[in-house]
């Protein structure tokens, strides 16, 4: 069963200049699917369409069989509990502790449930600290814990390691590996190809508003398609030098 289905999706913010143009893709529930593409290619737009934060100008978006593009806001909120959307930044409230920030996902959540979510991201012992008292990696992991409080079936993640140093990136990567081992699928927008090769089951490349490539990470790195080579060549050169 598909978790996420795009059928002929078109989206423009300026008339006559579509960011996405007839894009179609079928994303499996259990897979960790990375969305790659050049800056401005529409990767994040795709993720926001999946979350129902944007509506397509044409085409259809389905999540768990529900027509995201036609749902009223109340139904969208229920759907987002099943597949929460994590923005690029941690989006924490500075005056709330990490535990309190995580609990904001569901005010009915028990303290035990919140602590379990924090434990899954390695922050059980830091729950009483404020965001200003922890580093960027812990803040990002708190945002992931906030999503886990909902007991989601799927995650929509926009650039989970952007702005993080190597140590913080490694911490987030460890959490994502743990979630994958637990069977939780995700759509991950990222330009971090090292993370992609370590974590992804599938890769979707967005170029010129369309689905330019879909395959495994190995197929992605080996592809000779110009749209793919433009992305992978710098990474492969750096990896060879390192």
Where are these regions (language model features)?
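Catalytic Walker B motif of ABC-type/P-loop ATPase nucleotide-binding domains
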Residues: 155-158
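A short, surface-exposed alpha-helical micro-motif characterized by mixed small hydrophobic
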Residues: 196-198
């Amino acid at each position: 069963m598909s978790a996420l289905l795009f059928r002929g999706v078109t989206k423009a913010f300026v008339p006559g200049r579509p960011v996405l143009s007839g894009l179609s893709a079928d994303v499996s529930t259990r897979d960790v699917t990375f969305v790659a593409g050049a800056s401005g290619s529409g990767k994040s737009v795709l993720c926001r369409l999946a979350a129902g934060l944007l509506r397509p100008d044409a085409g259809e978006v389905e999540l768990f069989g529900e027509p995201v593009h036609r749902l009223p806001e109340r139904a969208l909120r229920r759907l987002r509990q099943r597949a929460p959307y994590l923005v690029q930044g941690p989006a924490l409230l500075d005056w709330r502790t990490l535990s309190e920030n995580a609990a904001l996902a569901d005010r009915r959540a028990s303290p035990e449930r919140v602590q379990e979510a924090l434990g899954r991201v390695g922050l059980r012992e830091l729950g009483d600290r404020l965001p200003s008292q922890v580093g960027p990696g812990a803040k990002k992991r708190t945002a992931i814990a906030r999503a886990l409080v909902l007991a989601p079936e799927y995650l929509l993640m926009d650039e989970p390691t952007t702005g993080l140093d190597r140590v913080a990136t490694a911490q987030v990567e460890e959490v994502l590996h743990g979630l994958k081992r637990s069977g939780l699928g995700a759509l991950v927008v990222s330009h971090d190809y090292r993370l992609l090769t370590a974590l992804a089951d599938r890769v979707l490349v967005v170029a010129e508003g369309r689905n330019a490539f879909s395959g495994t990470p190995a197929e992605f790195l080996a592809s000779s398609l110009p749209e793919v080579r433009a992305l992978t060549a710098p990474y492969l050169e750096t990896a060879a030098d390192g």
